[in-house]
Design a protein with these regions (language model features):
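A glycine/proline-hinged amphipathic helix-loop "lid/cap" segment
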Residues: 1-63, 299-300
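Alpha/beta-hydrolase superfamily serine-hydrolase fold, recognizing
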Residues: 12-14, 46-300
Length: 300
C-alpha cells in the first residue's frame, strides 16, 4: 500500500492533493471528489432535523433501533464534503460497528466561521438525547475523522461544560488537534504522507476561525484544552500521518487529566487511511474493527 502511495508522491500527485496553495474552489473540488462515493442500494438514508440541524440517519442491513448510535462529525477540512458527501463514510462505520449512524450536516467554512460547525454538532447531540430522538446517552459514541476528529473532541468538551448527559465514548481518527502548530515538534515527511501538509491544515484552521480568530482556542485546537471528566477516548492514527504528533500530545494531555484513553498507532498508515476500508484495504478494515471493539466494550 505505502509503496503505491510513495509512487504517487514521486510522480507529483502530492502537489495535487491537500495543497495549501490551492484556491478555495479547487480545494473543495478535490475534497468532494475524494469523499463523494455512492452508498449501497441496501443502505437506508433518512434525512431529518435534530436540534434544528440537518442530519442523516444511515442504517445498514442488520441494524435496528436497539443498535448503538454513532454521532458522526465528518471530515472534509471544514470546507467541503458536507453531509451528502460523507454518506459513504457513515455507511462504512455502520457496517463495521453494527451501529446506526447519525451524520450531522454542519455548516461549512469559510462562509460560516467558528463556532458554527461546533454549535451545530452540539445542537444535534442535544436533539439526539432529548425530545427529537430520545436516544440513551450511554448508547451513543461521538466519532470524527480528520478535522471531524477535532470537532468530536470539541463536542465532548461542550457537552461537559453545558452539563448535558455524556455519551459513552469519543473516537478521533487522525484528528486535527492543533491548528496553530500542526504536527507539533515532529518533522513531517511529505513523501511518507502524500495527502497532508501542515500548511494545508493551518490554512483550513484559519478558514474555520476567520480573520482574527484564535487558533489556540481549546474548542478549535483541543491540545490546549482541559480534558478532565471526558468519557473514554480512542485516538487512532497512522504513524506516518502528519497529525501523529498532535495525537501524541492530546494523548499526553488526556492521560494527565485522568481520561481513560486508548492510543492506537497503525504502522505505515497515512492520514485518513481508515476511509480506505471502502476500497477493501485490509489495514483500514483492521482499524475499523478496532473502533468497533472499543465502542462495543464501553456501550451501556
Amino acid at each position: 500500500m505505502m509503496r503505491g502511495l510513495r509512487s504517487l508522491a514521486d510522480q507529483g500527485m502530492a502537489d495535487r492533493l491537500l495543497n495549501p496553495a490551492d484556491a478555495m474552489a479547487v480545494a473543495r473540488e478535490k475534497l468532494n471528489a475524494l469523499h463523494g462515493h455512492p452508498v449501497a442500494p441496501d443502505t437506508r438514508v433518512n434525512w431529518t432535523e435534530l436540534g434544528g440541524v440537518r442530519c442523516a440517519w444511515v442504517q445498514v442491513p442488520g441494524v435496528d433501533n436497539a443498535s448503538p448510535c454513532l454521532l458522526l462529525c465528518h471530515g472534509g477540512a471544514y470546507i467541503a464534503a458536507g453531509g451528502d458527501g460523507y454518506l459513504f463514510y457513515a455507511e462504512m462505520l455502520g457496517r463495521a460497528c453494527g451501529a446506526r449512524v447519525c451524520l450531522v450536516d454542519y455548516r461549512l467554512a469559510p462562509e460560516n466561521h467558528y463556532p458554527a460547525a461546533l454549535d451545530d454538532l452540539v445542537d444535534a447531540y442535544r436533539g439526539l438525547v432529548n425530545e427529537d430522538a430520545g436516544e440513551a446517552p450511554g448508547r451513543i459514541a461521538i466519532i470524527g475523522d480528520s478535522c471531524g476528529g477535532a470537532l468530536a473532541v470539541a463536542t465532548l468538551l461542550r457537552i461537559r461544560d453545558e452539563d448535558l448527559p455524556a455519551p459513552a465514548v469519543g473516537v478521533a481518527l487522525g484528528g486535527w488537534f492543533d491548528h496553530e502548530t500542526p504536527s507539533g515538534d515532529r518533522e513531517a515527511d511529505p513523501i511518507r504522507d502524500p495527502f497532508a501538509h501542515p500548511d494545508f491544515t493551518r490554512a483550513r484552521g484559519l478558514d474555520y476561525v476567520g480573520m482574527g480568530g484564535d487558533l489556540r482556542n481549546p474548542f478549535v485546537s483541543p491540545v490546549y484544552a482541559s480534558l478532565k471528566d471526558l468519557p473514554p477516548l480512542l485516538l487512532q492514527v497512522g504513524d506516518v500521518d502528519l497529525t501523529f504528533g498532535d495525537a501524541e500530545r492530546l494523548r499526553a494531555r488526556a492521560n494527565a487529566d485522568g481520561v481513560d484513553t486508548t492510543f492506537s498507532v497503525h504502522p505505515e498508515m497515512i492520514h485518513g487511511f481508515q476511509g480506505l476500508a471502502s476500497a477493501g484495504i485490509p489495514e483500514a478494515h483492521a482499524a475499523l474493527a478496532e473502533v468497533a471493539a472499543f465502542i462495543s466494550s464501553r456501550i451501556r
